């Protein structure tokens, strides 16, 4: 539409959480929200939202210039619908990844972050109004744990690094 802005300059530096929020948008609080239980039903879905249930993967790179070069880049990854998933971070220079996060199989399993994300999204999408509170708590819990792990490992890696700054 010609009425929608193509781009905007942010008022502050964006965090991975900010980007995730935008990519999860489904016009919350407007008549166009496909999950809304209020308003004119003919308006729901009038505009296609970014955070739809047909998303399957999102990744973004966070560059942290205040850290040494080998720790600067973190890739944040999430599977399933952006409105119903949780991002996890990966250092760019790792050689192995825990099995739960590393891969998946063709068989649905709770032993895989990929399949757990897909199952949560599928169940929550069908009952969004009753599920969104739980999904948001899960997303914030995962994010909080991931931020704590990043802080812990950044400190550990900085302490053991032969040169504190590049």
Regions from the PLM with identified roles:
Residues 1-45, 49-53:
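Long, internal scaffold/assembly segments composed of regular secondary structure
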Residues 39-41, 45-154:
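Substrate-recognition/cap regions that form aromatic- and gly/pro-loop-enriched pockets
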Residues 159-166:
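Conserved small/polar residues in nucleotide/adenosyl-binding loops
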